[in-house]
């Protein structure tokens, strides 16, 4: 987004891969502030990407994978959804490499879970709070690679990576 202030973030995974992001606080201030605060509080450290769908998105930020108990929920407070169908002008398109907040059917239910698009997903535009994008092509390649991993089911969850994709940390670079 040209001429827009950015905040850089760096997701480091336990396997050594990295996704570099640029966040847009002027376009989605509540969402960026929430994400940055959770990162600074180390909320995401040790959480996994629990839902990956090839040619769609990879989603994480809400669960720890426990070998004995499976997916263990980690809760954070909900925030206002910053997207058009919720009365907020958010011009960020859900293109390959864009990061956006996951939510339930309730428009103001986003909290900590986010997803990174691994393909253009225009049907999400105006319905989910996009708030940044991958800063470089290598970061997009990492996201796409994770989107292609083998997945399975656990209880009522589907599209769970068979080999956990674990966030080591997310650093904010201001």
Predicted regions and their residues:
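Cyclophilin-like peptidyl-prolyl cis-trans isomerases
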Residues: 1-174
């Amino acid at each position: 987004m040209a001429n827009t202030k950015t905040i850089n973030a760096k997701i480091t995974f336990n396997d050594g891969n990295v996704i570099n992001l640029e966040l847009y606080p002027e376009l989605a201030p509540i969402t960026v502030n929430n994400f940055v605060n959770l990162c600074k509080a180390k909320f995401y450290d040790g959480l996994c990407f629990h839902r990956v769908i090839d040619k769609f998105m990879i989603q994480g930020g809400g669960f720890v994978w426990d070998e004995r108990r499976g997916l263990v929920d980690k809760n954070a407070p909900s925030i206002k959804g910053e997207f058009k169908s919720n009365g907020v002008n958010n011009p960020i398109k859900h293109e390959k490499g864009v990061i956006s907040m996951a939510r339930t059917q309730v428009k103001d239910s986003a909290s900590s879970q986010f997803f990174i698009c691994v393909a253009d997903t225009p049907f999400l535009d105006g319905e989910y709070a996009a708030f940044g994008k991958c800063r470089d092509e290598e970061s997009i390649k990492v996201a796409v690679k994770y989107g292609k991993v083998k997945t399975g089911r656990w209880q009522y969850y589907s599209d769970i990576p068979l080999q956990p994709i674990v966030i080591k940390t997310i650093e904010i670079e201001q």
